[in-house]
Amino acid sequence: MRKVTLTLSAIALALSLNGAAMAKVHMPEVVSQGVTVTELAHQQPIKWVSVAEIEKSLEGQAPMAVGFDIDDTFWFSSPGFYRVKLEYSPNDFSYLKNPEFWEKMNNEWDKFSMPKQVGIDLVQMHLKRGDTVYFITGRTQTKTETCVTKYVQEGLNIPA
């Protein structure tokens, strides 16, 4: 009797392991199928545009508000960030969460940032058109800020 019980138990166990258990999980709709390496290799060529082409495309349009990022877009600020990173956390990016870093960057080390010529040209084109230019930054706000506004204004030739 014992052998029969063990045999039936073994058969029942084997049969129960045969089926896959499926949890009922909500699956969202597929939004994007993604791309393959082949598709990436066949991308369309990039069309670079000049400030003159942008200006021409805006002819006849009413003045508009435009916004531009500051750091490493219009403003080559990597040297200042690099200098302060070495001081606060040379081996990681924890310096970005350190208020002392931002005080130093926004008040001292931004003087090592440089405007990019294309940024100067683009801002001047928009100002000439009568557009309102806004600058956007992801920088952490500090108690004081003596460099950023001053150097962006001076570097991009923005009238006071």
From Swiss-Prot:
The principal location of this protein is periplasm
* Keywords assigned by UniProt, alphabetized: Hydrolase, Magnesium, Metal-binding, Periplasm, Signal
Q: Which residues bind Mg(2+)?
A: 69, 71
Q: From the UniProt record, list the reaction(s) this protein catalyses.
A: a phosphate monoester + H2O = an alcohol + phosphate
User: Which residues does the Swiss-Prot or TrEMBL record annotate as the active site?
Assistant: 69 (nucleophile), 71 (proton donor)
What's an example of a GO molecular-function annotation for this chain? Answer: metal ion binding
Q: What class of enzyme is it?
A: hydrolase
Q: How is the cofactor bound?
A: Binds 1 Mg(2+) ion per subunit.
EC numbers for this chain: 3.1.3.2
InterPro entries documented for this protein:
Acid_phosphat_B-like, HAD-like_sf, HAD-SF_ppase_IIIB_AphA, HAD_sf
Its required cofactor(s), as named, are:
Mg(2+)
Protein's name in the database: Class B acid phosphatase
* Organism this protein belongs to: Proteus mirabilis
Q: Which gene encodes it?
A: aphA
